[in-house]
From Swiss-Prot:
Keywords, sorted A to Z: Protease inhibitor, Stress response, Thiol protease inhibitor
Entry coiled-coil feature ranges: none
Entries under Gene3D superfamilies matching the protein: 3.10.450.10
Entry keyword Transcription: no
Tissue specificity comment: In tubers of untreated plants. After ABA treatment or mechanical wounding is mostly accumulated in leaves, to a lesser extent in stems, but not in roots.
Induction of the gene: By abscisic acid (ABA), jasmonic acid (JA) and wounding.
Single Gene Ontology MF annotation: cysteine-type endopeptidase inhibitor activity
Chain positions of motif Secondary area of contact: 18-22
InterPro entries associated with the record: Cystatin (IPR027214), Cystatin_dom (IPR000010), Cystatin_sf (IPR046350), Prot_inh_cystat_CS (IPR018073)
Domain of life: Eukaryota
PROSITE patterns, sorted: CYSTATIN
Full protein name: Cysteine proteinase inhibitor
Assigned protein family: Belongs to the cystatin family. Phytocystatin subfamily.
Length: 66
């Protein structure tokens, strides 16, 4: 079974940026999974000049209600 296969984006709660070899974005967001709202944290590394984007981390941090 594929994890996170049924996620649907709801909203962004928070974004932080860090300058690295490019930019690292730390995003907290809400998504629904089979109708249940859950909160996730993701870390995305971006190097614009190389057209490079990579998800470094994506994990659920809070269970929410329907």
């Amino acid at each position: 079974q594929t994890q996170n296969a049924h996620l649907e984006f709801v909203e962004v709660l928070n974004v932080k940026e860090q300058v690295v070899a490019g930019m690292m974005y730390y995003i907290t967001l809400v998504a629904t999974d089979d109708g249940y709202k859950k909160i996730y944290k993701t870390k995305i590394w971006v190097k614009e000049w190389e057209n490079f984007k990579e998800v470094q981390e994506f994990k659920q941090i809070v269970y929410a209600t329907k």
